[in-house]
Amino acid sequence: MQRDPGTALVLFSGGQDSTTCLAWALENFERVETIGFDYGQRHRIELDVRPYLLERIRTDFPAWRGRLGGDHMIDMAVLGQISDTALTRGVEVALNANGLPNTFVPGRNLLFLGFAAALAYRLSAKHLVIGVAETDRFSYPDCRDDAVKAIQLALNLGMEKRFIIHTPLMHRDKAQTWALADWLGGEALVKLICEGSHTCYSGDREHRHSWGFGCGTCIECNLRAAGWEQFRSCKEAPVTAHEMT
């Protein structure tokens, strides 16, 4: 595979999707840096596992080690202060009247991509990589393809740059996300994502399942578990390089 000689900045939360996207970026770009956001999320454990994941990628994947650069953590406490959601308040996860779960944090990805672009501007990084998808049962408005394209246009107009926002998972479900990780880094990466990444909205690191740690009952745990089972059941099916790009 011929890699882009430029620099990519990956929005890296410490979850399954962003870890997979980090591997994708390391396979596709010569230089990769990461950015994370602390907005007071109730599942803050995802931020705590980030250093472990970055270190393991450096030690376990020699081909990627030299391409993985700096990590940047941004304090976004103000987002948690103005958001009344299940991810920023101690309330039970439920559906809102508009059909979206109350785990939706309005404006989150718009702000994340804006701050990431500001950092990318300083780093002279043209590429932004984010693990959003519109294939989940609940597709958040700021995770949809048309929203991301609109954000890219706004950033380019507002900064007079030519950023490209890459969304490797946009049209992939969770089973296909597991398959992409397997294709990129083999069983070693799949195992690292299982053991090291965190997706559970409850922040549960006590209960270990075949697909990783979590409460096993929240929306994200259910999606991750279902995707894992489908991925393992289809593991023997051949996968082409075209399907993974």
UniProtKB/Swiss-Prot annotation:
Pathway: Purine metabolism; 7-cyano-7-deazaguanine biosynthesis. Its EC number is 6.3.4.20. Keywords: ATP-binding, Ligase, Metal-binding, Nucleotide-binding, Queuosine biosynthesis, Zinc. It catalyses: 7-carboxy-7-deazaguanine + NH4(+) + ATP = 7-cyano-7-deazaguanine + ADP + phosphate + H2O + H(+). One of its GO terms (biological process) is queuosine biosynthetic process. GO terms for molecular function: ATP binding; ligase activity, forming carbon-nitrogen bonds; zinc ion binding. It comes from the Bacteria. ATP binds at residues 12-22. HAMAP family: QueC. Belongs to the QueC family. Catalyzes the ATP-dependent conversion of 7-carboxy-7-deazaguanine (CDG) to 7-cyano-7-deazaguanine (preQ(0)). This is 7-cyano-7-deazaguanine synthase 2. It comes from Mesorhizobium japonicum (strain LMG 29417 / CECT 9101 / MAFF 303099) (Mesorhizobium loti (strain MAFF 303099)).
